[in-house]
């Protein structure tokens, strides 16, 4: 028979999550799902998907970069389309391992929806510390802009996609702006994103105990480097200029607890930023990625709305005149 304390803990967690959903229901949009129960309007996805061409791995870093880094590029076959959206995609792995292969399925799904996808490597900790991984993403955006004409990319419709530590990096990129400490020295207007799809996002590094992954990434403990922890936390960089965010997160995530998503979502709403939170009930960190299809469908539908030519979010990011 299960221990009464265990039952109480899980009931408390479920009731707290249900209460949170009721409280937040009036701002933004929350989906709560179970496996096999998709909460997605299929009309928001392209019904006719595109084939795509897979390029050989492309080096995106300049010759003087500390490490050679490559990107996997998929070009959708979209005859008659003058310019199409693009997606910068970043894998997870605790900032220290894994690679673009983990995100290949998501990249293919985006390419089928008409996005040029750029699925990148980045430098790993502990050899390289924050903010060097962010610099890799900023360089990838510069490289993507330099290839925009060749690949028929509309640079005002580039979105960011990531999971776990990749979601952290892509969110930091989205919030770094064109000025300030996160923008120097490789940032600028070219790093603007039209929207973000982020799963399992560690949004506030100050919430973690001094575990190896975060300490290796920052290069010290919270007590030793509190300013760096704050600067590296997307939740502490939100302004009303943030692009729209679609977040998905497992409600039973023990590695990156769900309050990283719910608090981030609340902060976005407080700034008037369009956002959606897709809670995967009963899923942990890795299960939320392995069984992600309905969340990704919902996320891509959200991205599709943001990259429409008349999107309000696009007008906010790229005002005319």
Indicate residue ranges for each PLM-predicted region:
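N-terminal cap/lid segment of alpha/beta-hydrolase-fold proteins
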Residues: 33-80
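Short beta-strand element of the alpha/beta-hydrolase
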Residues: 83-93
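Short amphipathic alpha-helix adjacent to the substrate-entry channel of hydrolases
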Residues: 101-118
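Alpha/beta-hydrolase active-site loop
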Residues: 128-149
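Primarily recognizes the serine-hydrolase "nucleophile elbow" in alpha/beta-hydrolase
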Residues: 142-210
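Mobile cap/lid helix-loop segments that gate and shape the active-site cleft of serine hydrolases
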Residues: 205-237, 243
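Short beta-strand/loop motif that positions the catalytic acidic residue
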Residues: 247-249, 253
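C-terminal catalytic histidine-bearing segment of alpha/beta-hydrolase fold enzymes
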Residues: 248, 258-321
